[in-house]
Amino acid sequence: VSAGVLIAVLAGCSTGEPGEAQPVPSTGSTTSESVKPTTSKPARPKELKVDGIDPCATFTAAQRSELKINETSTKPLDVLTNDKPVPTCRNRADGDTMSSYNVSLISGVGIDHWEGGSNLDVVAKTVAGFAAYQYKLAGTSEAYCSYAVDVADKQQLVVQFFPIGDGFTQDQMCQNAAKGAELALATLQTLK
């Protein structure tokens, strides 16, 4: 089903222009740990409830400009691949190469969802002090990279970075997903 989400995002999109991919600069507040996802997670710095928040409000105008986002749309996506679409904002970026930052705000399911067996490569991370999992489709380095961030009990912020066309390495995709998660977390702390 993850491939289905990817196909839905990529359908009808192509760059039409060659270009060099540029990763979004990192501020260095994303860290990685070489641990299995079932290892205990660090305590979150604060609780950020996402109930009722518009996922398109998670990037400010300045952040959208920084990420080169020029188009946003809201559409529920089955991010958890459980046949239960969640509120998602698709943020299309038209930089040197096209991409999409999909931001989903999930209530009722915590990041422990990503700890079970699946067709995903899952790595424990920390984003701005919040426990997170970086995940991507197992066995590929060309599809996407996502971060699921523990924002409250049974709630998570998921930021997926999808390239539209060629031009991004797996590391660049994951750097961009981490940067998107970091920016969305900063904005979430100002909402509600």
Features from the language model and the residues they span:
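Short, low-complexity, disordered segments immediately C-terminal to signal peptides
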Residues: 1-6, 11-37
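Sequence contexts marking disulfide-bonded cysteines in secreted/extracellular proteins
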Residues: 14, 55-57, 88-90, 144-146, ...
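Extracellular/mature segments of secreted proteins
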Residues: 21, 62-67, 96-100, 153, ...
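N-terminal low-complexity, Pro/Thr/Ser-rich intrinsically disordered segments
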Residues: 28-55
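A short, solvent-exposed beta-edge/loop patch
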Residues: 44, 120-192
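Amphipathic alpha-helical segments
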Residues: 54-72
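Short, solvent-exposed recognition patches
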Residues: 66, 70-134
